[in-house]
From Swiss-Prot:
SUPFAM superfamilies: Nucleic acid-binding proteins (SSF50249), Translation proteins SH3-like domain (SSF50104). Residues 13-25, 224-240 have a biased composition (Basic residues). It comes from the Archaea. This is Large ribosomal subunit protein uL2. Residues 1-25, 207-240 are annotated as: Disordered. GO terms for cellular component: cytosolic large ribosomal subunit. Keywords: Ribonucleoprotein, Ribosomal protein, RNA-binding, rRNA-binding. SMART domains: Ribosomal_L2, Ribosomal_L2_C. One of the primary rRNA binding proteins. Required for association of the 30S and 50S subunits to form the 70S ribosome, for tRNA binding and peptide bond formation. It has been suggested to have peptidyltransferase activity; this is somewhat controversial. Makes several contacts with the 16S rRNA in the 70S ribosome. GO terms for biological process: cytoplasmic translation. Disulfide bonds: none annotated. Gene3D superfamilies: 2.30.30.30, Nucleic acid-binding proteins, Ribosomal protein L2, domain 3. HAMAP family: Ribosomal_uL2_A (MF_01320_A).
Length: 240
């Protein structure tokens, strides 16, 4: 009898494929959207900058004027001791948090909310930023790093600036061990072995005197889990 496929183990949720979220510093999101931010602003001070395992950007611990502490994504150029502002009347300055409707066109922003008060969902990776393209009645258009333009509620908050940690991809890993430990902080199994390179007991494409599939790669949508590899319920295969 063959062994479980990687996709079966991943679906079961074994420790190897489970994200090690217990190593994280905590939730990185905006403070609750209260009247203080809707009508004015609240000041916060950066008291520490932390490395968060599994995240491509550093996070800052910010203490606000009401003694509330939050972990937030910081932009390039922010250091310990600097003040940030959150609210509708905040200044347009890197690190400050404002509703999209109050940010001028062409300003780079990150950590954008999709629903007002959700804490920030879009553009959170190191070195990333989006641009506010235009404003209209009841909507703001933002161009994301992918080039896609998204229509959002003007009350959705965003941070002015570019996420810190840019240029992280410019330095090569050089050694396989470094890449392994880097990806072990995420729910990524690495390296990824090809099915034809495995033994017959490990994969439907394994075994044989040379590396070949040896059977059709198209399988039914309703086939058994241990055989469901390759082109699943494909309408067509090959070059168009």
């Amino acid at each position: 009898m063959g062994k479980r496929l990687i996709s079966q183990n991943r679906g079961r949720g074994t420790p190897k494929y489970r994200s090690p979220t217990h190593k994280r510093k905590g939730a990185v999101k905006y403070r609750s959207y209260d009247e203080m931010e809707k009508d004015g602003k609240i000041l916060g001070t950066v008291i520490d900058i932390l490395h968060d395992p599994g995240r491509s950007a550093p996070v800052a611990k910010v203490k606000f004027a009401n003694d509330e502490e939050r972990l937030v994504l910081i932009p390039e150029g922010i250091q310990v001791g600097e003040e940030i502002e959150c609210g509708i009347s905040a200044e347009i300055k890197p690190g400050n948090v404002l509703p999209l409707g109050e940010i001028p066109e062409g300003i780079p922003v990150y950590n954008i909310e999709t629903i007002p008060g959700d804490g920030g969902k879009l553009v959170r990776s190191g070195g990333c930023y989006a641009h506010v393209i235009s404003h209209d009645v009841g909507k703001t258009i933002v161009r994301l790093p992918s080039g896609f333009s998204k229509v959002l509620n003007p009350a959705c908050r965003a941070t002015v600036g570019v996420v810190a940690g840019g240029g992280r991809k410019e330095k090569p890993f050089v050694k396989a061990g470094k890449k392994y430990h880097s990806l072990s902080a995420k729910a990524v199994a690495w390296p990824k072995v090809r099915g034809v390179a495995m033994n017959a007991v490990d994969h439907p494409y394994g075994g044989g005197r040379h590396q070949h599939i040896g059977k059709p790669s198209s399988v039914s949508r309703h086939t058994s889990p241990g055989r469901k590899v390759g082109h699943i319920a494909s309408r067509r295969t090959g070059k168009r």
